């Protein structure tokens, strides 16, 4: 019987649904056996026989064998569509038709013996999906796409023989990378129509083959085990981008910047000679070479002018003048620094800051002459000098000179105090300024305090408070640390004082047996009207002492602020 006659047959559906979710058409037993070829098998068969039949591994014989009753006709479906193979699905649910996934997984329910016309006739029949299935394929079987799970490209568009599954449709040329869906194994059913022949909902380029997730196929997805992608097909992926027109200067896909066309420029070097008028005529021209890439390479000879007559280096005639100017700028910068330091100390400690007697080596400060005199004769001061001599390896003469510098500083401070007029009135004015604006509502009063330099704290001028601070463990630790700090800084102070050029000149006079401080005192007496400028570079040792004192005061302030924060 010609299988094409099935197109003209009147199909009618019985009321009783058949197995596999397919409404089998009514007719004689011989018609069913003849059309579907089940009668030739003779009885129930195992799963392996169906697998071999689906993969074309077993020759199909006795295609039109007749005979057999209803039991023989439906025997194979009973053995195949048992409860275990259906996976617990409702056997009476309509709408699956020939899209049954269990059948599709094993090659489909049609077999491999029928021509394309019979398949098209079954696909064109619209009654098989009358159960209201949402998996309606809008395309006919001849238009379904090929195996999109293999990424085979367009290698099998000319023939339908390679379309092993009825659920595959050739993708259009402008689709997602020639047959590769965006999300082929979507678990949302009809959301992804690309798995059932419909348009793809994804965007962008194909993502290649996605895993089968343990061999569990989603409904409607068919895997073609026959047509695996060949190495040539895999290598051909992405050929669309390679076939795009490339720039003329992109060999092998590597971008090369277009060479910039430049004109050869003759670079002239003029000789730096002031007594040669023909220097412009004798100007040297560098060697210019144009390489193959169009770039200009200039080779300069920087040593050529050095051998010419009248060659003169830059800055030879102005070297001495520049050194003098730099020295002047350095002196002015030092004086400006000293002036700012004096202003800072005056604002911080008051106008009487310069009237204090100090020892730069021991960091001792007092406003009483007796105290400074006793300090200069004390064992603590002598111990500091011995530490300086031990660390610096200075001679005994040098150490005596450093001690005389401190004594001379004390004498000059005493003279400054005597020359200051109205000292008591100025002190009273300062007291008034301190308490200015203070009222009874402010609850403020002036009290005496004792400053501890070791701990950087102010202690009330009370016997109990002072004794309590002396016995505190913080003062014991701070006293030892501060003593070590004084020793370290004393060495730096002595070294900086001796490095001062003015102090060096005084030291030379001191070694000769002269008194260098008397000359400075006489010069200072002539400048009594310029007391504010008395501590300028003429007193080098005092400048260095003030610098060291400022550094120590800054460290003390930092320690005090850190203690208050804690």
From Swiss-Prot:
Keywords: DNA-binding, Metal-binding, mRNA processing, mRNA splicing, Nucleus, Repeat, Zinc, Zinc-finger. Residues 317-335 have a biased composition (Basic and acidic residues). It comes from the Eukaryota. Residues 527-556 have a biased composition (Acidic residues). One of its GO terms (biological process) is regulation of RNA splicing. InterPro entries: AKAP95, ZF_C2H2_AKAP95. Its main location: nucleus. It is found in: Nucleus. A zinc finger (C2H2 AKAP95-type) spans 359-381, 452-475. Core component of the DBIRD complex, a multiprotein complex that acts at the interface between core mRNP particles and RNA polymerase II (RNAPII) and integrates transcript elongation with the regulation of alternative splicing. Belongs to the AKAP95 family. This is DBIRD complex subunit ZNF326.
């Amino acid at each position: 019987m010609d299988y094409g006659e099935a197109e003209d047959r009147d199909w009618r559906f019985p009321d009783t649904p058949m197995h596999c979710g397919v409404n089998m058409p009514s007719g004689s037993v011989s018609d069913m056996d003849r059309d579907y070829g089940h009668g030739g098998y003779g009885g129930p068969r195992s799963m392996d026989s169906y697998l071999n039949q689906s993969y074309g591994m077993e020759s199909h014989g006795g295609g039109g064998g007749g005979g057999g009753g209803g039991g023989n006709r439906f025997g194979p479906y009973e053995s195949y569509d048992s409860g275990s193979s259906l996976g617990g699905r409702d056997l009476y649910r309509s709408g699956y038709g020939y899209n049954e996934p269990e059948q599709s997984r094993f090659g489909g329910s049609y077999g491999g013996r029928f021509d394309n016309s019979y398949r098209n006739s079954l696909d064109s029949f619209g009654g098989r999906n009358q159960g209201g299935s949402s998996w309606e394929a809008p395309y006919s079987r001849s238009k379904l796409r090929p195996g999109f799970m293999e990424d085979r490209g367009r290698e099998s568009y000319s023939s339908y023989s390679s379309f092993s599954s009825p659920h595959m449709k050739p993708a259009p040329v402008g689709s997602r990378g020639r047959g590769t869906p965006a999300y082929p194994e979507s678990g949302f059913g009809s959301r992804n129509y690309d798995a059932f022949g419909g348009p793809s909902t994804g965007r962008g380029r194909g993502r290649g083959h996605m895993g089968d997730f343990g061999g569990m196929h989603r409904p409607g997805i068919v895997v073609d085990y026959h047509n695996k992608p060949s190495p040539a097909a895999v290598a051909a992926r992405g050929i669309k981008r390679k076939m795009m027109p490339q720039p003329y200067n992109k060999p092998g896909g590597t971008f090369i910047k277009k060479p910039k066309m430049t004109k050869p420029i003759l670079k002239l070097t003029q000789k730096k000679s002031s007594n040669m008028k023909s220097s412009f005529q004798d100007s040297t021209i560098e060697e210019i070479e144009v390489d193959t890439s169009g770039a200009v390479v200039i080779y300069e000879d920087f040593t050529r002018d050095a051998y010419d007559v009248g060659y003169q280096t830059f800055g030879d005639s102005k070297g001495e003048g520049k050194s003098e100017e730099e020295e002047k700028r350095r002196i002015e910068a030092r004086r400006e620094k000293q002036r700012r330091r004096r202003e800072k100390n005056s604002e911080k400690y008051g106008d009487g800051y310069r009237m204090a007697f100090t020892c730069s080596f021991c960091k001792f400060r007092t406003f009483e002459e007796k105290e400074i005199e006793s300090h200069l004769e004390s064992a603590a001061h002598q111990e500091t000098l011995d530490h300086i001599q031990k660390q610096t390896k200075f001679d005994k003469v040098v150490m005596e000179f450093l001690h005389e510098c401190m004594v001379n500083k004390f004498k000059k401070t005493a003279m400054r105090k005597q020359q200051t007029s109205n000292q008591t009135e100025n002190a009273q004015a300062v007291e008034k300024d301190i308490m200015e604006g203070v009222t009874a509502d402010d609850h403020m009063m002036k009290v005496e305090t004792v400053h501890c330099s070791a701990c950087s704290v102010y202690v009330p001028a009370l016997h109990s408070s002072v004794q309590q601070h002396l016995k505190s463990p913080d003062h014991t630790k701070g006293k030892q640390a501060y003593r070590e700090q004084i020793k370290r800084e004393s060495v730096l102070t002595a070294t900086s004082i001796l490095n001062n050029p003015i102090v060096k000149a005084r030291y030379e006079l001191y070694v000769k047996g002269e008194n260098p401080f008397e000359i400075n005192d006489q010069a200072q007496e002539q400048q009594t009207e310029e007391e504010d400028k008395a501590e300028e570079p003429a007193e080098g040792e005092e400048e260095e002492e003030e610098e060291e004192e400022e550094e120590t005061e800054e460290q003390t302030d930092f320690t005090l602020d850190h203690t208050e924060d804690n």
